[in-house]
């Protein structure tokens, strides 16, 4: 789980561009395919950016995240949207949805494929018939290892980012924050790389039809660092 300090840094350093970009592409994809969505759920919703985008476009939305810090920010951002603090592996909402999303490499935080399968089975149950499950996972070939890279939040606060593999082959993001040149804190976020073909196989095992598995959601908006997967409940 992310620390409360990291959640604040995540929000203030402007990392919202990831769900913002995905939200624009998702809405365009829905329009292009003439798909009408009335309700949506965002798994691992973070600070609620995608939920806010969906709500502003007339879709009744909800969100959940394992991090209490992320959900606290989401509730402050959009108090009218229902948010749950929960474990995605066990999560069972009280109602069904037309669309379920899970972006920002959230599934790469799930270490075991057995837990991924549990998530897929649960999503299948709380999707409406004909509903869509759209998510992304890391594209291993396009992950840029290296650093440290620096980012200035303001005149006094600076972030340092290092991306590396550990001895298990997992991809790690080390975030270190300084204020006035003095160390404040650091956090390491670990992700495991999942084979997209294995992931698609698990979806099919759980009853989904896999409509798309590519490095983009829209043809004109390629996103080389992620695989985008679109699945439909039959």
Predicted regions and their residues:
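Conserved class I S-adenosyl-L-methionine
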Residues: 1-35
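Nucleotide donor/acceptor-binding cores
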Residues: 37-39
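Class I SAM-dependent methyltransferase SAM/SAH-binding core
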Residues: 41, 48-90
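A short acidic, Gly/Pro-enriched loop at the edge of an enzyme's catalytic core
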Residues: 92-99
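A short beta-strand submotif of the Rossmann-like class I SAM-dependent methyltransferase core
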Residues: 102-104
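A short glycine-rich, Lys/Arg-flanked "PGG" loop and its adjoining helix->strand segment in the class I
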Residues: 117-129
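SAM-dependent methyltransferase
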Residues: 134-202
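C-terminal lobe and adjacent flexible extensions of AdoMet/dcAdoMet transferase-like proteins
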Residues: 198-234
């Amino acid at each position: 789980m992310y620390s409360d300090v990291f959640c604040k840094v995540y929000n203030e350093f402007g990392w919202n561009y990831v769900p913002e970009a995905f939200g624009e592409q998702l809405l365009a994809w829905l329009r292009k395919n003439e798909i009408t969505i009335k309700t949506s759920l965002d798994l691992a919703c973070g600070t609620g950016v995608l939920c806010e985008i969906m709500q502003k476009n007339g879709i009744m939305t909800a969100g959940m995240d394992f991090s209490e810090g992320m959900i606290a920010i989401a509730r402050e951002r959009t108090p009218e949207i229902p948010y749950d603090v929960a474990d995605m592996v066990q999560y069972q909402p009280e109602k069904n949805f037309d669309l379920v999303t899970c972006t920002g490499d959230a599934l790469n935080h799930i270490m075991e494929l057995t837990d991924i399968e549990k998530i897929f089975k649960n999503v299948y149950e709380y999707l409406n018939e004909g509903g869509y499950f759209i998510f992304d996972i890391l594209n291993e070939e396009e992950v840029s290892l290296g650093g440290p890279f620096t980012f200035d939040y303001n005149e006094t606060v600076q972030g340092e980012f290092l991306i590396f593999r550990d001895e298990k082959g997992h991809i790690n993001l080390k975030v270190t924050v300084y204020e006035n040149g003095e160390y404040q804190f650091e956090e390491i976020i670990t992700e495991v790389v999942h084979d997209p073909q294995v992931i698609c196989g698990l979806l099919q095992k759980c009853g989904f039809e896999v409509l798309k598995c590519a490095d983009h959601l829209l043809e004109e908006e390629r996103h080389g660092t992620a695989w985008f997967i679109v699945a439909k409940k039959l």
